From Swiss-Prot:
GO molecular function annotations of the record: fructose 1,6-bisphosphate 1-phosphatase activity; magnesium ion binding
Biological processes annotated in GO: fructose 1,6-bisphosphate metabolic process; fructose 6-phosphate metabolic process; fructose metabolic process; gluconeogenesis; sucrose biosynthetic process
PROSITE patterns named among the record's database cross-references: FBPASE (PS00124)
Protein name listed in UniProt: Fructose-1,6-bisphosphatase class 1
Keywords, alphabetical: Carbohydrate metabolism, Cytoplasm, Hydrolase, Magnesium, Metal-binding
Quaternary organization: Homotetramer.
Membrane-crossing residue ranges in chain numbering: none
Cofactor(s) the record lists: Mg(2+)
Reactions listed under catalytic activity: beta-D-fructose 1,6-bisphosphate + H2O = beta-D-fructose 6-phosphate + phosphate
Amino acid sequence: MKTLGEFIVEKQHDFSHATGELTALLSAIKLGAKIIHRDINKAGLVDILGASGISNVQGEVQMKLDLYANEKLKAALKARGEVAGIASEEEDEIVIFEGDKAENAKYVVLMDPLDGSSNIDVNVSVGTIFSIYRRITPLGTSVTEADFLQPGSQQVAAGYIVYGSSTMLVYTTGHGVHAFTYDPSLGVFCLSHEKVCFPEKGNMYSINEGNYIKFPSGVKKYIKYCQEQDEETQRPYTSRYIGSLVADFHRNLLKGGIYLYPSTASYPKGKLRLLYECNPMAFLAEQAGGKASDGKHRILDITPEKLHQRSPFFVGTESMVDDVERFIREFPDA
């Protein structure tokens, strides 16, 4: 049995000039995940369920657990001293860590502390998403927004934690995707899936079909394609949608499938956040042999212009993402 800590140290040689900072940073995220795991499991017994009454910069009401998870992860990252600053879906602006150690830290972290938190009240899986970049401003200075507005192709590491029937941490440093299952009796994450890859063919699609009338024409055509009978391509595909990006992505990663969150009339630029959700999941997808697109472009090639930028998002088995891109090209909206 190999623990996450042992595995990270073992793989440290994958990085040129590695001196342990990234290892310590990932350990901080691991600690934050353990704390969130513990408190999610007793959320119904203490007053951390429901809405907080506070709205974020996008005007969305934040859940109590969103804010709680944000504070716990932020504290864990700050305490290790390997992070110069963070950007979070729950923070209006970047958070700059102070002190000499932070100013000399090489990395910045972007995160969605608790994806799918509206599902907590009904005991449905939720997750944490994180993304790590090497800063571009000089060491010895405070980080700026420019350190966070880098294309996803510049990510050093990315991953997620899914809190479900078991808690799993899945991550990549650009050398494959690896998954670890939490053993609460020992308090450690143990390697359970090494070098995870999408199956070559998928047969599941994940989308909120209740919004069908609002979807672009190409996406509507693709959904109909998924539902058609065709033995050669093993259609119809199965529709599976949880409403938590982490949970839907995780299932599709292991079973084969595509997750779709297109632009709609309500969200013409898409709803998911490029920096906190799309980029890290796209990095994981590509490292697992999959693909991620905004319908026209590779997600990891997009240069972000603002912290809370949104994007349409299609991610999963490569051939399925290719298909939806083809439908979007062939059936453009006027």
